[in-house]
Amino acid sequence: MELLSEYGLFLAKIVTVVLAIAAIAAIIVNVAQRNKRQRGELRVNNLSEQYKEMKEELAAALMDSHQQKQWHKAQKKKHKQEAKAAKAKAKLGEVATDSKPRVWVLDFKGSMDAHEVNSLREEITAVLAAFKPQDQVVLRLESPGGMVHGYGLAASQLQRLRDKNIPLTVTVDKVAASGGYMMACVADKIVSAPFAIVGSIGVVAQMPNFNRFLKSKDIDIELHTAGQYKRTLTLLGENTEEGREKFREELNETHQLFKDFVKRMRPSLDIEQVATGEHWYGQQAVEKGLVDEINTSDEVILSLMEGREVVNVRYMQRKRLIDRFTGSAAESADRLLLRWWQRGQKPLM
């Protein structure tokens, strides 16, 4: 029994030392990463090649064994000839002049604070660097909106394409509401699925106030400001009617800026009719001029593959270990809020 007790004590010491070393190592790595700029990675995926391979695999699967054998032999010969031709061109220093126009496909699945704009800005910069005449951009967008400044920046990033006269199509399969629509309206063309949620051109803000609860517990709160409207409404302090009025005024000003922006992007839109904060399904949004066409992103991309090379560009942020945990928690919270929002905004089926 005494031997077992000594062994347990020895084991506990070993575990303590190992944990202490691991903690110190983690702190050192974290500090080193914090001081080092975290550069991401640009990933380019050829969707045209993927579609071609999928089509060929399906065709081969429908053949009998003899046909498959002949097909594989022909494909092997074809690929060998293509590789040989490419090698010969490279050896002679020839540059391909018959390249097809490209369709650059970007993705934006927005969270409440629109932090995905950090990747979007890099993707757009990459597209601008490689863009050639006859190319175009398709953005697959999904967002219920969020922080004004975050989505304002995201819309401004898309504006960079518009300023360069680069054709931009935004596709909405599920939702592009509020800040999401602020981004979508920058496009030359908006394509929506029939039951995607579109619109919600409005501004909302809400917060609880715990002042009466704190007073009932004899807890005093002091709030000192320099500037008459440094704080309008607070969580803990006592709100005044003057503060509430100023807060509503700021909301209305933000709403007007939102309306002006949408009107500038889509001049033919009856902004007063659609800027009520309401949302509509895609097939209703077409009638109101909020979107231009009813279709899915899949069909849009497939239709553009004829005579073009379709390429998906993604900028992947490198994350520290601690950021991965906090990021996962934030994404879970965003998904939960989105689920509640969707349930409250539309009937269930």
Swiss-Prot record:
It is found in: Cell inner membrane. The active site is at S178, K230. It is a single-pass membrane protein. Its main location: membrane. Multicopy suppressor of the HtrA (DegP) null phenotype. It is possibly a protease, not essential for bacterial viability. NCBIfam families: PRK11778.1. This is Probable protease SohB. It comes from Escherichia coli (strain K12). The lineage of its organism: Bacteria, Pseudomonadati, Pseudomonadota, Gammaproteobacteria, Enterobacterales.
